[in-house]
Amino acid sequence: SDLPIVSGAMGYISYDYGREKENVAARHPKEVDMPDLILCFYDNFIIEDHQEKRFYLVANGQTKEVDTLLDDVENTVAETYTLWKNGQIPGTKDDHSKIRVTPNFTKEDYKQAVQDMIDYIVEGDIYIANMTQHLTVESTRTPYDVFCSLRRDNPSPFGGYLNYGDLQIVSASPERFLQMRDGVVATRPIKGTRKRGATREEDAAMRKELEESDKDKSELLMIVDLERNDLNRVCMPGSVKVTEMYSIETYATVFHLVSEVQGRLAEDKNVVDLLEAAFPGGSITGAPKLRAMEIIEEL
């Protein structure tokens, strides 16, 4: 099928799940009390093709009468259209309400953590690592409002909104971690970003700067090598190849430097084996992966 999904699970897998899988001991309390993993299987999917302006209904093992199911879908679409027409869909209007953002690092502590990470690189423990921080946001806006704003103001190829009642997940990312079609596995790591220019000349200059950046190419090369190693653990011998290297991808607000690694999944392996081998992705950890994760947890 050319549809993005016809069956299967939807959900999220947290970084902490990957940390525990790699036996990296937690050295700090959790910032948020939430499950490490939630995957849900759904009977039905409504799929919207934005380019073709078509809707598809996919039903799996549905015992309900088909006509009744179609009526339910038509009613849902009609109600949604009415809300949209009346301006009642969340996130469709500009919201300039104030927000408060609180990081879990002070500026000085974060700078020190980055310096400590640089010291580990100089000492040869790691080649590259991803030092992030946790931001707590206080706002009157709902998570769905935030998702809609992200889709409108900074559209990304991959994103989602998951509502689990007391817990909502909002995601937006330009990066494809893993894809598998007909047994072929692909990962497309990103390392290297430049903002879009305000003019055509500025745009071309920023793109050229990224194309010629040895620093960004070196970072991406390290992650490509890591991803090749991860895929080789579950793919057929000799099948793992770098199919694309140092490509520039253009988005609404930025340029990204991207590569792609592909392999054919071994006959005795499945998607769970693939996730076990590759998660978390190298672009959000560093290389070597295990040591980078240990240092991230320390700092």
Where are these regions (language model features)?
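Extended alpha-helical targeting/anchoring segments
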Residues: 1-299
